[in-house]
């Protein structure tokens, strides 16, 4: 590396002397005298290494003289040669001649002494903390390093940053800078400098401001400002560092395609939240607390309600409160400014300060203990008020939540009391949680602000994470931090050493693999492997009873002695207790595991968190918006997390984040910066040798230098090398012929004058030693300088030669011009020449003018063309620029796509290899898992065998219980003897007290036995084997029977007391029976009320049927009237047409008669008669109209009265319904009271049972022990037989249950098939009904066609009438004309008369034909009416079919209810089986506890037995046979002592195995819980299927109901019956508690339906009124038509009369004209009336259509109500699940339900057409309740039997416990031996279990890795395919262009 001159260093300004030695120093160093043979470094204990000079050598010893003048004699291997002076303070230690520890140490020390803190060490940079400010980060330094290569500038963090930046731009690869080192080494400062550098060099060109949204500064300012804010909340003073980062951060700075800043983001790790509440003495909490209290911003003090003295707050004053190197006031302003720059809103800013202040107040909250209670209560509320105010909470709610939190137990929440310490712990946890979540929220907000949404391509990541920590007290936080450093060190080693050497092998370079001893895999696997420290910690967190001790024991069992990195710490005085030690790369660390389980689970007070979530402060509420407690997570995400945990632990989250970080780092090109802490005292310039050497070793600095020297750190591809360095010797590579790049590179390097041992040729690259590539670069620069100089000389020579030629041409031209000018000067004065001068221009002027004109035209054309060509040229230039830009972009895109494609292919290949390896591992693990499953199956079989033997022993226990009854009989015989033993009472009282205590202990042990089920099974397995041994021991114990007899009659008083207690118990039992009788009487009363309601329902059903009949009759009448109205409407229209035609004819006739000369007198009289008849007809018409109107009004009134009556009936029914609902609620309250009474009775019963047990225990103390021991063997045998029979009985019951389940499954399938069949039948019936409806529609259509035909005939008739009228008018005209011209035109009149007579004859014939046709039409009308009647019959048949369908539906409902009943019975039986199983488990558990407790008291009893035996031996000595008994007792004593030793050893083994067995039991219980949850899930799925079926059938039923909407109109009659039935149902539903919701939902649906029906009824009423109006109008039209018909007939008669008396008609002509005029006016009025009626008809039709549309809407609403009912049915199913506890109350209603069923059958016949749907529902409900009543009665009977049995069992068991206590001496030996065997069995089982768990864990992990690998492979393959397709498209596009 070439050192720059002082002039070159001038650009660094005042930083130059801190970066590189001056030229003067370098020259002095080179001229410094140096003896390479004698100048050495020597190892020395104090200084590690010292500079020395060799004095002499003697064999393997060397004598040296140190700099301080001391003489030392050391071994040769402790002497290291010194580097020449020119290497002093060398910038890259890899360049040193002698590379060793002292050389590196002293180079760093000398540079540090000269304040050159940065030094290269091979491929990475080493920096030493100066502990003072140096001017090496000034802006001029930043500018000086920009764009400089590494070897062109001194070592600096800016150089590393710039190299990473340049690599990112040139290599198009993400970069990372890993700044690592111990705490206090300067990592955070260097991180800030890196960010400063990028923010300076990568800004946009004109420093544009970001004006979007909330941003207050540029992106560069925000990136820089993020550090002060994060440091304020995340940095604190520690022992080693005043500004220590207590969290790790990975800052990614994203750059755009041009290398400018695009955005940034920050990821944080491991915030040390415990520092919020606890600090060591020499440390302090986070800076923000002390910044706030610095009083720089007084408004904060006032806003946060705090003081300026940190000592007032406990959380922040446990250590120091000031730091000399930090000005808290200035830091507060910087923090406040950073918050503003980063775009936090004012509200968010205030929230940050308030939450910080609230944390401070939390530490001052005081609590005290209540008097005579452990419950905590607040000791003052002032501090809590402040904290709650700052968090926008209610102070009382906060204190209540802290002291009385609500805890979820099952599905309910209960209030839990807290001790004072628990409350303080909760407050501390909440403070830490608030602070941590606020910190993470701030990081998220910063990231949102830094994300500018600009396009970004690559990023540079800067990692600043807490360094390695070794404290006196190291906890879980230190383990996580140290583990992170282990992983980073491993990544560094892998990148620097392993990958480097693997690259050599891959390229085929001769290389001997060097093991640098930096393999950290052992320590990492110890921490993170499946059975490592984190795995065991997470496993312990899953167990509720796990403690720190159990965690430590598991760690020791798993790793102590098995791993060299796991050690047991040695106790050291003055230091905190350590539980285990880990050997890290940086040293051995002692860890204290106190509180690790709680830290890992990180529990919070859920009640306070709930308050936080509801806080008015948005920030606080958002912090905890996603929080869910462990219980809630367990319920919501069961099985979703790894290893079955219901929540993610701190360690799991930490490992997940760490893995993400390592993945990010592996995807980048890393640059390493090693920070070194020079001393522990923070003294500038001082360096502790041992401390620095330790860091150099641990950081891998020396190994990095060594491999850099030995290896080949620089490499380049052959093609690139040939292209770049060909210039060094172009002649070495021949031109014009192909030559391989590798051979060309070899020739080129061979021809250059360099050291040929400094490079190697690989397969694809050429490798260089350190420094050689730099030398080649310098040679290339020199060669390029030479070539450029030569090129410049040639170019300059060429240019000068061209200029010389131009000069020659100019010279010749000048000579020519001079010659011509001289000649001209000689001849210009000649006369001829003057004339020539004058004439010559004139000759050419004309030509010149023409030429000028031509030239102008050409000039103009040329100018235009030039303009066009210029525009075209510009356009083409723009296109060319655009195309060039697109071409460049495409080339860049193709290149990037090619690079990414290659990378993706490489990753894909790697993933495929990993996948294959993982598949092989999975196959292996699967095989091992199968083996383990087989072993588990064998263990399960053994377990079942043990269970069988346990059942046999239970039978033996039952036999023992029978002895209680016998002892009761003997009690009376002992009463007389007790009087004689009263004197011995005092001596025996103590024994009795002991026995009582032992009895209680045995009972407690009996209860505890349930927790150790598996261990007891093993013990029971050997009890049967010990029976023979017990028989032998009985003979030995017979000698002690005499003394035991005395204990039979010792407590007469106790007996009397027991008898009194028994009497009290009997009296309480009688009270309970009386309460039961009262309940029965109440139930009977309710049954009587139900029967009354049923009778009411029947009456209402009868009324409903009558109303339905009336409605049907009215509907039929309405239809007939509608048809008549239509017919009359048509006939009326035709009559109107006829009337108008006749009017016109009359007018014509009158005109003709006037023309003929007037009318005769006869005609006048006829006209008068006609007029009178017309007046008469008009009066008749008006009278008929009035009569019809009166009739219509009467009908209307009648209809309105009927509607009002029906409304009143509806209101009455509503009131009845409300009354019934009220009675229902009252009955429900009574049922609740009865339930509470029953619970009180049950409690009283339990208390009585306890009293009975106590009395029985006291009675058992009076029992004789002689006969008990005498009968012991026989009773055990009997008990065994009984247990065997019970086991057989249980197995038989189990088989029966299985058979029942299978039978129910079959019945379920049959029910499903039956349901499908019913569905099919329903569809067929629906199809038939649709066919009938279609036929009815077609018939109606035919009817309409015939009606139209009838109307056409009427129109024809009207036409004839018009013709007749026309003829009459003609007659009148002729008459008039005749009167005028009678004399003149007599003949004409005669002819006209004849013609008129002919025309009248023809008209009469036509009229007759029309009348005949009308008669035929009447017949047709009659026939159609008959057809309509037939269709009505068909409709009735359809209704009958609907009724049949209803009946089938009811049958279906019956089948469904029976199936539901069977299902519920099966579920109840399943629950009872589960209860029995739990009861048996409880009993077995109690037995096991009793046995274990008997072991505890065995020794005491044995000593007592020995004393008794000694007394027996003393008594026998007084007799003659004393000696013999003593000898026998001594034998027994020896034997017992020997057995005692054996038992003691076995007992210890059994205890150890018992612990293992307990762990096994816990694991099995977890597995059982998982299986149970799976079964519950399947049951839930089945329930959902059943619910779906129910919903489907409900929809079918509701659809059928919608087809009967017409019948719903008759609901008023059926309402009374329905209400009565609902009342009965409500009486029964009182027993169903939560199932009442179904009734409520159904009631609401019914009300909605009633509302819809009321609307429909109103529309129907409107339609009926409209129909009545139409009927009235029809009657009017009919009367008018009849009048017209009569008028036509009279006109016909008039015509005949006119023919006979023509003369009279002439006289009456004038009157006829007047009448015609009157008729005309009347006709016009009738036409207007007709139009009005037609408008009314059209309006009525529109109203009818509206009614139809409204009915359709009502149908849609009904369907919607049906869907709502289905949803409510689903909710009902959920609510029914909670009604199991009321089933016992339902059983008493069985008889009532049967009566209801009978009456419902009768009601069904009465209301077949009425309230069918309601009755069907009620019947189904009744049947359901009937089944439930039966089940409840059965269960009640079984419960009574079980109660009696359990009472008997309790008595027997209490007696048996006394028997066990007395017989414990004989059982001792047997139990000890059993325990020994149990130990061995447990040990074997535990080992198998552990091996199985380990294998399963490995299998799961491998399976998970395989899945991830497969996913990655698939993703990579898809990406490769996409990239290939994209690349092809790009190439195609380029080629097309």
Swiss-Prot record:
Write out the biased-composition intervals (Basic and acidic residues).
1127-1155
Q: Residues where N6,N6,N6-trimethyllysine occurs?
A: 132
- Taxonomically, the superkingdom here is Eukaryota
SMART domains linked to this entry: IQ (SM00015), MYSc (SM00242)
Provide a Gene Ontology MF annotation, just one: ATP hydrolysis activity
Q: Which residues carry this modification: Phosphotyrosine?
A: 389, 424, 1463, 1491
The name this protein goes by in its record: Myosin-8
Could you tell me which species this protein originates from?
Mus musculus (Mouse)
């Amino acid at each position: 590396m070439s050192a720059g001159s002082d002039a070159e260093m001038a650009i660094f300004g005042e930083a130059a002397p801190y970066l590189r030695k001056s030229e003067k120093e370098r020259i002095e160093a080179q001229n410094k005298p140096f003896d390479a043979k004698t100048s050495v470094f020597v190892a020395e204990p104090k200084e590690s290494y010292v500079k020395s000079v060799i004095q002499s050598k003697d064999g393997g010893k060397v004598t040296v003289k140190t700099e301080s003048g001391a003489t030392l004699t050391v071994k040769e291997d402790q002497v290291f040669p010194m580097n020449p002076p020119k290497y002093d303070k060398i910038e890259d230690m890899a360049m040193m001649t002698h590379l060793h520890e002292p050389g590196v140490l002293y180079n760093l020390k000398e540079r540090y002494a000269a304040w050159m803190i940065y030094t290269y060490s091979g491929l990475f940079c080493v920096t030493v903390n100066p502990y003072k400010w140096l001017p090496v980060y000034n802006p001029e330094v930043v500018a000086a390093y920009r764009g400089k290569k590494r070897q062109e500038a001194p070592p600096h963090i800016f150089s590393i940053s710039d190299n990473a930046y340049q690599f990112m731009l040139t290599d198009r690869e993400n970069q990372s800078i890993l700044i690592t080192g111990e705490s206090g080494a300067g990592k955070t400062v260097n991180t800030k400098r890196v960010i400063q550098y990028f923010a300076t060099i990568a800004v946009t060109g004109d420093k544009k401001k970001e004006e979007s949204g909330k941003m207050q500064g540029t992106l560069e300012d925000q990136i820089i400002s993020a550090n002060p804010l994060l440091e304020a909340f995340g940095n604190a003073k520690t022992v080693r560092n005043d500004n220590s980062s207590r969290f790790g951060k990975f800052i990614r700075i994203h750059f755009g395609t041009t290398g400018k800043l695009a955005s940034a983001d920050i990821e944080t790790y491991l915030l040390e939240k415990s520092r919020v509440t606890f600090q060591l003495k020499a440390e302090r909490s986070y800076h923000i607390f002390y910044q706030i209290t610095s009083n720089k911003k007084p408004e904060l003090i006032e806003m946060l309600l705090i003081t300026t003295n940190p000592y007032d707050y406990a959380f922040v004053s446990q250590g120091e409160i000031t730091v000399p190197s930090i000005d808290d006031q200035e830091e507060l302003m910087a923090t406040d400014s950073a918050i503003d720059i980063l775009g936090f809103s004012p509200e968010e800013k205030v929230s940050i300060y308030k939450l910080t202040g609230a944390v401070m107040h939390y530490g001052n909250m005081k609590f005290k203990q209540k008097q005579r209670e452990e419950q905590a209560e607040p000791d003052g509320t002032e501090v809590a008020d402040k904290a709650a105010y700052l968090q926008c909470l209610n102070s009382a709610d906060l204190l209540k939540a802290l002291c009385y939190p609500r805890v979820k137990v099952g599905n309910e929440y209960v209030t839990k009391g807290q001790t004072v310490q628990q409350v303080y712990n909760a407050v501390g946890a909440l403070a830490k949680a608030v602070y941590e979540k606020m910190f993470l929220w701030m990081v998220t907000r910063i990231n949102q602000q830094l994300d500018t949404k600009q396009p970004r391509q690559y990023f540079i990541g800067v990692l600043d994470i807490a360094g390695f920590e070794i404290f006196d007290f190291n906890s879980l936080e230190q383990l996580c931090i140290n583990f992170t450093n282990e992983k980073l060190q491993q990544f560094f080693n892998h990148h620097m050493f392993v990958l480097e050497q693997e690259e050599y092998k891959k390229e085929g370079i001769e290389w001997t693999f060097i093991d640098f001893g930096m393999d950290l895999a052992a320590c990492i696997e110890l921490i993170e492997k499946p059975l490592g420290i984190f795995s065991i910690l997470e496993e312990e967190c899953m167990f509720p009873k796990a403690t720190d001790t159990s965690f430590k024991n598991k760690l020791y069992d798993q790793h102590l002695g098995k791993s060299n990195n796991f050690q047991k710490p040695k106790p050291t005085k003055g230091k905190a207790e350590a539980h285990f030690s880990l050997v890290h790369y940086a040293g051995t660390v002692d860890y204290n595991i106190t509180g690790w389980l709680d830290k890992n689970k990180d529990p919070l007070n859920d009640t306070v968190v709930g308050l936080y979530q509801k806080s008015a402060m948005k920030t606080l509420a958002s912090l905890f918006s996603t929080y869910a407690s462990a219980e809630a997570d367990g319920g919501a995400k069961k099985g979703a997390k790894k290893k079955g945990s219901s929540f993610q632990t701190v360690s799991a989250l930490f490992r997940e984040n760490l893995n993400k970080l390592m993945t990010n780092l592996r995807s980048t090109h890393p640059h390493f910066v090693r920070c070194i802490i020079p001393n522990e005292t923070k003294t500038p310039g001082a360096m502790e040798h041992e401390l620095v050497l330790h860091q150099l070793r641990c950081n891998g600095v020396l190994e990095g230098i060594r491999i850099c020297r030995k290896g080949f750190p620089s490499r380049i591809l052959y093609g690139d090398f040939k292209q770049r360095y060909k210039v060094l010797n172009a002649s070495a590579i021949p031109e014009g012929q192909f030559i391989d790049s590798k051979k060309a590179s070899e020739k080129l390097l061979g021809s250059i004058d360099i050291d040929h041992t400094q490079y190697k040729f690989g397969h694809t690259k050429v490798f260089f030693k350190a420094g050689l590539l730099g030398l080649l670069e310098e040679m290339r620069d020199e060669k390029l300088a030479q070539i450029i100089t030569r090129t410049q000389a040639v170019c300059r020579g060429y240019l000068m030669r061209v200029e010389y030629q131009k000069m020659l041409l100019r010279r010749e031209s000048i000579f020519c011009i001079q010659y011509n000018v001289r000649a001209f000067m000689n001849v210009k004065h000649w006369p001829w020449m003057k004339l020539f001068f004058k004439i010559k221009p004139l000759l050419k002027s004309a030509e010149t003018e023409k030429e000028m004109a031509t030239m102008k035209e050409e000039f103009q054309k040329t100018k235009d063309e030039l303009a066009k060509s210029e525009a075209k040229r510009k356009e083409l230039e723009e296109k060319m620029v655009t195309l060039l830009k697109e071409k460049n972009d495409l080339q860049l895109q193709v290149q990037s796509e090619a690079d990414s494609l290659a990378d993706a292919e490489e990753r894909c290949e790697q993933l495929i290899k990993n996948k294959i390896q993982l598949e092989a591992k999975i196959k292996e693990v699967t095989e091992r898992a199968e083996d383990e499953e087989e072993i588990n199956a064998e263990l399960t079989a053994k377990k079942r065998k043990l269970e069988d033997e346990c059942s046999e022993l239970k039978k033996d226990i039952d036999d023992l219980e029978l002895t209680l009854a016998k002892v009761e009989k003997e009690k009376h015989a002992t009463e007389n003897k007790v009087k004689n033993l009263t004197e011995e009472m005092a001596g025996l009282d103590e024994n009795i007290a002991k026995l009582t205590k032992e009895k209680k202990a045995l009972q407690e042990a009996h209860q505890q036995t349930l927790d150790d089920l598996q261990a007891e099974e093993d013990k029971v397995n050997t009890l049967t084997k010990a029976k023979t041994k017990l028989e032998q021991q009985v003979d030995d114990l017979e000698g002690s029977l005499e003394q035991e007899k005395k204990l039979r009659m010792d407590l007469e008083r106790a007996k009397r007391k027991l008898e009194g207690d028994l009497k009290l118990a009997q009296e309480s039992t009688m009270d309970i029976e009386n309460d039961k009788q009262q309940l029965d009487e109440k139930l009977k009363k309710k049954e009587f009320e139900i029967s009354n309601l049923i009778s009411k329902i029947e009456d209402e059903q009868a009324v409903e049927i009558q109303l339905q009949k009336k409605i049907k009759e009215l509907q039929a009448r309405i239809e007939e009237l509608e048809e008549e109205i239509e017919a009359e409407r048509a006939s009326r229209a035709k009559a109107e047409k006829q009337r108008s035609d006749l009017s016109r004819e009359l007018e014509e006739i009158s005109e003709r008669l006037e023309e003929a000369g007037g009318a005769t007198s006869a005609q006048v009289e006829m006209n008068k008669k006609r007029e009178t008849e017309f007046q008469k007809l008009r009066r008749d018409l008006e009278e008929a109209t009035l009569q019809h109107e009166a009739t219509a009004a009467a009908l209307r009134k009648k209809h309105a009265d009927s509607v009002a009556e029906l409304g009143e009936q509806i209101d009455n029914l509503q009131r009845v319904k409300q009354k019934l609902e009220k009675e229902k609620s009252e009955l429900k309250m009574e049922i609740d009271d009865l339930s509470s009474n029953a619970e009180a009775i049950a409690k009283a019963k339990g208390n009585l049972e306890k009293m009975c047990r106590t009395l029985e225990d006291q009675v058992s103390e009076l029992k004789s022990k002689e006969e008990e021991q005498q009968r012991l063997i026989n009773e055990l045998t009997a008990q065994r037989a009984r247990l065997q029979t019970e086991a057989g009985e249980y197995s038989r019951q189990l088989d029966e249950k299985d058979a029942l389940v299978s039978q129910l499954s079959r019945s379920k399938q049959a029910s499903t098939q039956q349901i499908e069949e019913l569905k099919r039948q329903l569809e067929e019936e629906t199809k038939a009904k649709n066919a009938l409806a279609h036929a009815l529609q077609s018939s109606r259509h035919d009817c309409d066609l015939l009606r139209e035909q009838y109307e056409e005939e009427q129109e024809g008739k009207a036409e004839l009438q018009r013709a007749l009228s026309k003829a009459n008018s003609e007659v009148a005209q002729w008459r008039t004309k005749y009167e005028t011209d009678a004399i003149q035109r007599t003949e004409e009149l005669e002819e006209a008369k004849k013609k008129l007579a002919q025309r009248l004859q023809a008209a009469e014939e036509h009229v007759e034909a029309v009348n005949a046709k009308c008669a035929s039409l009447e017949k047709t009308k009659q026939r159609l009416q008959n057809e309509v009647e037939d269709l009505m019959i068909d409709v009735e048949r359809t209704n009958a079919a609907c009724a049949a369908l209803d009946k089938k539906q009811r049958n279906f409902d019956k089948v469904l209810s029976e199936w539901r009943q069977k299902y519920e019975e099966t579920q109840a039986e399943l629950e009872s089986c589960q209860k029995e199983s739990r009861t048996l488990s409880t009993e077995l558990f109690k037995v096991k506890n009793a046995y274990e407790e008997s072991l505890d008291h065995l020794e005491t009893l044995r000593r007592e037995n020995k004393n008794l035996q000694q007394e027996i031996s003393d008594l026998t000595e007084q007799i003659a046979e004393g000696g013999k008994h003593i000898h026998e007792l001594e034998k027994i004593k020896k034997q017992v002592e020997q057995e005692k030793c054996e038992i003691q050893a076995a007992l210890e083994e059994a205890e150890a195995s018992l612990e293992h067995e307990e762990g096994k039991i816990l694991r099995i219980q977890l597995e059982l819980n998982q299986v149970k949850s799976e079964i519950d899930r399947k049951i839930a799925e089945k329930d959902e299927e059943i619910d779906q079926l129910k919903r489907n059938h409900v929809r079918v039923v509701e659809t059928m109901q919608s087809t009967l909407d017409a019948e719903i109109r008759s609901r008023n009659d059926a309402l009374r019956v329905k209400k009565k039935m609902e009342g009965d149902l409500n009486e029964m539903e009182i027993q169903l508690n939560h199932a009442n919701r179904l009734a409520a939902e159904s009631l609401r649906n019914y009300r909605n339906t009633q509302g819809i029906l009321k609307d429909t009824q109103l529309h129907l009423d409107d339609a009926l009124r409209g129909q009545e109006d139409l009927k009235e109008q029809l009657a009017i039209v009919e009367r008018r038509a009849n009048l017209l018909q009569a008028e036509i007939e009279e006109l016909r008669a008039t015509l005949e009369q006119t023919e006979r008396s023509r003369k009279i008609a002439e006289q009456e002509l004038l009157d006829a004209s007047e009448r015609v005029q009157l008729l005309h006016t009347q006709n016009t009025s009738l036409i207007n009336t007709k139009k009005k009626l037609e408008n009314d008809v059209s309006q009525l039709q529109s109203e009818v259509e509206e009614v139809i549309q409204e009915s359709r809407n009502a149908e849609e609403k009904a369907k919607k109500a049906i869907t709502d009912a289905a949803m409510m049915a689903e909710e009902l199913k959920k609510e029914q699940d909670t009604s199991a506890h009321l089933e016992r109350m339902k059983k008493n209603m069985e008889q009532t339900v049967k009566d209801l069923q009978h009456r419902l059958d009768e009601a069904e016949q009465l209301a077949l057409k009425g309230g069918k749907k309601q009755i069907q529902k009620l019947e189904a409900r009744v049947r359901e309740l009937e089944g439930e009543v039966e089940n409840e009665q059965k269960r009640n009977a079984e419960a009574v039997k079980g109660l009696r049995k359990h009472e008997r069992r309790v008595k027997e068991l209490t007696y048996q416990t006394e028997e066990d206590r007395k017989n414990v001496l004989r059982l001792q030996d047997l139990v000890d031996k059993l325990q020994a065997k149990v130990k061995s069995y447990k040990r074997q089982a535990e080992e198998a279990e552990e091996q199985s768990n380990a294998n399963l864990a490995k299998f799961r992990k491998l399976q998970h890795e395989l899945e991830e690998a497969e996913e990655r492979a698939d993703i990579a393959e898809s990406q490769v395919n996409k990239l290939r397709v994209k690349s092809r498209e790009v190439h195609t596009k380029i080629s097309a262009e």
